[in-house]
A protein has these predicted regions:
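Structured functional modules or segments
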Residues: 1-72
Length: 72
């Protein structure tokens, strides 16, 4: 299947990262929380998989389309 990057839907700040490398996640599991325009947006896993890479850290600023987490 290959690795699938989970990207930021909008620019914002990472308030929290809920997963670590090696975690097994189900579709819909919250991977991280992105604050944009004073709203907290939970970023869900698009599919079942394993966390291959966590690109962002808490407090990081991201742009729209930036990779947050990579699922395998």
């Amino acid at each position: 299947a290959g690795d699938e990057p989970v990207k930021a839907p909008m620019p914002g700040n990472i308030l929290d990262v809920k997963v670590k490398v090696g975690d097994t996640v189900k579709a819909g599991t919250v991977l991280c929380v992105l604050e944009a325009m004073k709203m907290e947006n939970e970023i869900p896993a698009p599919k079942d998989g394993k966390v291959a890479q966590v690109v962002v850290t808490k407090g990081a600023t991201v742009g729209a389309g930036d990779t947050l987490v990579v699922l395998a």
